Amino acid sequence: MKKTHITEQKFADLGLNPQVVEGLEKKGFEFCTPIQALALPVLLSGQDIAGQAQTGTGKTLAFLTATFNHLLTTHAHEGRQPTQPRAIIMAPTRELAIQIYNDAEPLIASTGIKAALAYGGESYDKQLAKLQGGVDVLIGTTGRIIDFYKQRVFNLNNIQAVVLDEADRMFDLGFIKDIRFLFRRMPAPQERLNMLFSATLSYRVQELAFEHMHNPEHVVVEPEQKTGHRIQEELFYPSNEDKMALLQTLIEEEWPDRAIIFANTKYKCESIWAHLAADGHRVGLLTGDVPQKKREKILEQFTQGSVDLLVATDVAARGLHIPQVTHVFNYDLPDDCEDYVHRIGRTGRAGASGHSISFACEDYAINLPAIEEYIEHTIPVSDYDSSALIQDLPAPVRTPSARNQQRRTNTGGARSGDRKSNNRRPRQPRQHKEA
């Protein structure tokens, strides 16, 4: 773990419980990121916060640190049973909930605090057994948490700390009714420590904070550039007919160590996967209907390097911790300009450089003006030579059905090393759009 830091604020100087500091130091965390340096003093004073911060800024560590410190320095409610959670952390996706849990476990290893997961797509009985063994911090998605609540596995009467992560995404996915259902079954806002984090503090997010929090202080960490100064952005204008050949040619020209390819629909992702798998690439597919265990396996393979390319819908764009992504390909420009930022933000993290390549095709070029207005700069444009594109592409493999998702990761084939020697260079001299 790198010993660099962004601020001069040390965790040890914040007045945290010694057990919390010990857990942080064991993981190599000594100095705060900006969101941590701003949020933790407020939270340690007992004040609620509504924080605006992008993924990758350290917000997860901020709310985990505050939650654990609050539980260690505050007495549990009298008469509380071990199966009744004292803190609840709500996330919009299963993957994000799992990541938060994995980040939490080493921090509480020596504190006696027990964490448990609750999310759909996984064994109900396994999660139930964990909860019945005792839980202090419940981490999960709202649907499964409500399922357990309605089954009277636990109640929410003893909640002393609440975290709502990626609140804007909760709205996007239609979970806001679930959130309100849970909030209304907890102690009053002034009787608990409340933390809300969101990429944007839109009117609807602020309204939610006003409704279910106690006079929250707004903490905002704006990136210097929405897209990050370490990310090299590049834009092509391919015809629909050239898109797949251009993608394959650029992959072999760039030869990325680890790349994510985003498309706007499940159908398009499956088509891209089928072409890349047929060409011998080690490629995984991540869409919304991939079974949970398979999703976890694909992400593990991608993280460990046995899969080089991940084709995904925006389910993978936010919340997931995937280190060392070198390239992001926007096969389709997203319909939501914020999703462009979240997509390319998967690369260029933790001080590393990254490369984002986007296709403004016949179907999605219409989204480009809104994206460039949002990121406040034009994306450098490159031309390509159609005659330099790979022409001998094999026919795509048959796309597996949903019941055969485990076959969607082709890890056995070699990468297309024979084509790399062709040294194709489809790019023409760069043409930069006028600002």
Curated annotation (Swiss-Prot):
- GO MF annotation: an example: ATP hydrolysis activity
Q: Where does it localize? A: Cytoplasm
Concerning CDD domains, the annotation shows: DEADc, SF2_C_DEAD
Which family does this protein fall into?
Answer: Belongs to the DEAD box helicase family. RhlB subfamily.
Q: What does this protein do?
A: DEAD-box RNA helicase involved in RNA degradation. Has RNA-dependent ATPase activity and unwinds double-stranded RNA.
State the oligomer form and interacting partners. Answer: Component of the RNA degradosome, which is a multiprotein complex involved in RNA processing and mRNA degradation.
Q: Which GO terms describe its biological process?
A: RNA catabolic process
What gene name is given for the protein in this entry? Answer: rhlB
Q: Where is this motif: DEAD box?
A: 165-168
Start and end residues of each Helicase ATP-binding domain: 40-219
What cellular-component terms does GO give this entry?
cytosol
Q: What is its EC number?
A: 3.6.4.13
PANTHER family from the UniProt entry: ATP-DEPENDENT RNA HELICASE RHLB (PTHR47959:SF10), ATP-DEPENDENT RNA HELICASE RHLE-RELATED (PTHR47959)
Q: Where is this region: Disordered?
A: 395-435
- InterPro entries (UniProt xref): DEAD/DEAH_box_helicase_dom, DEAD_box_RNA_helicase, Helicase_ATP-bd, Helicase_C-like, P-loop_NTPase, RNA-helicase_DEAD-box_CS, RNA_helicase_ATP-dep_RhlB, RNA_helicase_DEAD_Q_motif
Which residue windows does the record flag with biased composition (Basic residues)?
422-435
In its UniProt entry, what is this protein called? ATP-dependent RNA helicase RhlB
| Organism, as annotated | Vibrio vulnificus (strain YJ016)
| Record keywords, A-Z | ATP-binding, Cytoplasm, Helicase, Hydrolase, Nucleotide-binding, RNA-binding
